[in-house]
Amino acid sequence: MIATGDKVRHPKMPDWGIGKVLEVTSDGKARIFFIHAGEKTILLSHVDFEKIEGEEAAHPILDNPSFFERATVKGHRSLPDARLDFLKLFPDGFEDAGYLNEERNYKVAARELLLELLSEQAFRELLGSGNFDEIVRRALQVANKTNLIFPNEKMGLKDGLKTPEHIQLFAERLFDLLYGNGEFRKRFETFAECLEEIEAAKWTTMTYFTFLAFPEKHMFLKPEVTKHAAALTKAELNYKSDLNWVTYSCLLDFARYLKDELVAMEMNPRDMIDVQSFMWCITPGKYD
């Protein structure tokens, strides 16, 4: 017998993935949310569910304390559905020539530019000589290499870097964010404070440079695109427009989960550039 909160698997529907029991009703039915199929109401006398326990039952989405609240939102488009939509656009997935030309190559080019202009050694030498203006010039050049940061937000960053004090603050905080030795959370928060000080505190600006410098572990946050992808998987993003560590930490957890799921579906993303591009491509209206 299964109960509310149990993790189960449908013996005849393995593609539905792991499910969590939302409710067992008095008339012998169970409402179950399956991670790849959404909510199903099933007569228990017709199915002998496999109960999942122990380490196998651990799941970053289903185990989140706010899962039940998110699971009750009506309508469900599954990750496998989104995968099919992506493959309609790019039949060869992340190796598709169209995908590489339209979505990946220009981001890789921006990463290469950042590593050329603001490598740790080059950045350190510029800081050591007090050449803060050149650091800002290079950072803005990297920002302008892609369309990831909205034009008005690029302008806001540029406008915030007019005084010597703001230019030096930004240069020092950006170096610490990318190459500092302290705990990353603290480096993140001090860079966020810098962006607030110069009135350029936007999530795109906040996450752009680490995303390009370290795409194996850091993610870019474009709010509406990311919120759509998180809602699709019922992930908890804890999104707030103000820059904060909780939202970014949830973003990293979600990005790792999504990457793992794409690997399990044989999509094999190389890094978070592919994962972010996938999120963009499956957002309604982006390729309609």
Predicted regions and their residues:
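Basic/aromatic-rich interaction segments and small domains that mediate binding to polyanionic partners
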Residues: 1-53
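Short, flexible loop/turn elements at secondary-structure junctions
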Residues: 12, 211-214, 279
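An N-terminal alpha-helical hairpin/helix-loop-helix interaction module that forms a charged
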Residues: 29, 56-198, 216-288
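Helix-hairpin-helix
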Residues: 193-210
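N-terminal, helix-rich and Lys/Arg-enriched segments in bacterial and organellar proteins
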Residues: 9-11, 19-20, 209, 225-226, ...
